Amino acid sequence: MINTHVKLPGLDLKNPIMPASGTFGFGDVPAAKKFNLNDLGAMVIKTTTPHSTTGNPQPQIAVLNTGVLNSVGLTNPGVDAVIKDKLTPLRSEYPNLPIMASVGGEDEAGYLEVAKKLSDSGLVNALEINVSCPNVNQGGMSFGVHPDVVEELTKKIKSLVKIPIYVKLTPNVTDITQIAKAAENGGADGLSLINTLLGMEIDVETRKPVLGHNIGGLSGEAVKPIAIRMVHQVRESTTLPIIGMGGISSAKDVIEFILAGANAVAVGTAHFKDSLASKHIADDLPKELEKLGITDINQLVNKVNFN
């Protein structure tokens, strides 16, 4: 029997697979209705802000040969509507599924409001603090590139909420370990990494960027080596649990992230090619572990053999 069970603060995962925030919306998008979400370790909902946001100008998504460039911009109906109209029915449908809510805001007060309301709702098991979204003009990555800001925000959120918090790190920094340490110093219970890399694609005929927002976040297979490297670097700098993400499309990719130091993973862009990607990866994981002679996935955490 292969053990894929992973226990993290607030998240008791039957397997280490979850959808990256935004991938399955609030559990209400078509892809999330194609299978039982209980087949995954957890559900991560789309980033929630204090008030409704409409996102960035269209087009918001460009599919590239090696990934996806997006500038969606945290579209959501606002925290009160999310709790009432999204999380309440999701929790009713999945009473035992670990749910992580992603927290966003334009300023510190916004982050604190959303975090407290989501925590007090009793509907989620943990919070992911999104200080790394590159597609908003205020908040998001503007918070996540400054260690002192990350530490202070983490500390204030931690003092307000009753559930574990995971800080989502941006790769758009010189040294991601400084941000990781700042989150740890602020009291974070875990880390999520990486968010998307800033990128741009230009249509040579119109001479215009392909995205309405001009610049977007790059995800998918092109970023996987960067994500693996950063997970390793962060693992070397902290003992906090890590949820790794960035270009995962197979069970082998999951194992690679675990070897680099992640405890669990999130799957995002792979769903553009296969709407059931996370389920297929979860189903394949025990088979891949068996091939390697591994009986417990936790045995592989940070077990890369360096040259």
From Swiss-Prot:
Residue sites binding FMN per the record: 21, 46-47, 130, 168, 194, 220, 246-247, 268-269
Keyword Oxidoreductase appears in the UniProt entry: yes
Binding note for cofactor: Binds 1 FMN per subunit.
Pathway noted in the entry: Pyrimidine metabolism; UMP biosynthesis via de novo pathway
GO biological process, one term: 'de novo' pyrimidine nucleobase biosynthetic process
Active site annotation, chain numbering: 133 (nucleophile)
InterPro entries, per the entry: Aldolase_TIM (IPR013785), DHO_dehydrogenase (IPR050074), DHOD_1B (IPR033888), Dihydroorotate_DH_1 (IPR024920), Dihydroorotate_DH_1_2 (IPR012135), Dihydroorotate_DH_cat (IPR005720), Dihydroorotate_DH_CS (IPR001295), Dihydroorotate_DH_I (IPR049622)
Cofactor(s) needed: FMN
UniProt EC number: 1.3.98.1
Main localization, broad class: cytoplasm
Subcellular localization(s) per the UniProt record: Cytoplasm
Keyword Cytoplasm: yes
Catalytic activity: (S)-dihydroorotate + fumarate = orotate + succinate
Record's GO cellular component terms: cytoplasm
Binding annotation for substrate: 46, 70-74, 130, 195-196
Annotated GO MF terms: dihydroorotate dehydrogenase (fumarate) activity
Keywords, in A-Z order: Cytoplasm, Flavoprotein, FMN, Oxidoreductase, Pyrimidine biosynthesis
Family: Belongs to the dihydroorotate dehydrogenase family. Type 1 subfamily.
Subunit (UniProt): Homodimer.
PANTHER family reported in the protein's UniProt record: DIHYDROOROTATE DEHYDROGENASE (FUMARATE), DIHYDROOROTATE DEHYDROGENASE (QUINONE), MITOCHONDRIAL-RELATED
Function: Catalyzes the conversion of dihydroorotate to orotate with fumarate as the electron acceptor.
Protein name: Dihydroorotate dehydrogenase A (fumarate)
GN (gene name): pyrD
